[in-house]
Amino acid sequence: MRKTKTHNVLRRLLAFVLIVSLLPLGYAGNVMAATTGTRNVSIQVTYGQTDARNVYGMINSMRRNSSDAWYWDANNYTKTYCNNLQPLTYDYALEQVAMKRAAEIALSYSHTRPNGTNYYTAYSENGVYAGVYAENIGVNYSSASALHNAMREDNANYSGQEQRRNMLNSQFTAVGIGHVYYNGYHYWVEEFANTVTRTSYTTPNNQTTTVNNIQIAESNITSDQIVVPSSIGNYIQMSAGQTIDLSGCYENIKVSN
């Protein structure tokens, strides 16, 4: 079966190179080699899953409202109206995909994952197997309503309404949404699928969380530096049996966007 994929990016205030400040070197599993050409990193993000789940109701409200459920045709003259759309089911397995992807786009804002693979490879990693799927991503929207208003793309033409068409796609039956705050920016991900995997409720994660084992392709790393605090100094002399606390050191990786 041919699988559809959508590459939709809301770019806002992204004219910068993302800097990954990793956890202290004393933290187990901080940075390690993965497969050839990739590296595993761990980062701390603050999840906002209560806000993320608020977007879910907004999407279904849009699908139910006949005055909202439309998009421009390719000619930008006529509209397609999406009648009798069924509400999407909130899928907690898809939410796990979206949460992982939200952390990943904080490092590399793209539908391509930091390890160089397509976004949908994250589905099977979380037990989601869909024939039709799509992803919407957004950055620097501090609230659920601000994100959704941008994703609606009310004033865009056909080429600019990809996110809108994803939300109104009759093939989709499930959605999961992720939201993280990292280095001063809010990152949001909406994952859509034509299958429902898990509907059992889970408590929303609104905590600062360590996300482990994010793979980054070596080709995406533009610089790699060990930062040593001044209290340790640039030169260390040790005697046999002596120990030195290096927990203040960390690795600073610059990742191309």
Where are these regions (language model features)?
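Short, solvent-exposed loop/edge segments of extracellular or virion-exposed proteins
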Residues: P229-Q237
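Ser/Thr/Gly/Pro-rich low-complexity, disordered linker/stalk segments of secreted
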Residues: R198-S223, V227, I244
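A well-ordered secondary-structure block
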Residues: K100-E104, R113-R198
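Short, well-ordered surface patches within globular domains
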Residues: A34-N126, R164, S170-V175
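Sec-dependent signal peptide cleavage junction
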Residues: L23-G37
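Bacterial N-terminal signal peptides that target proteins for export
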Residues: K3-L14
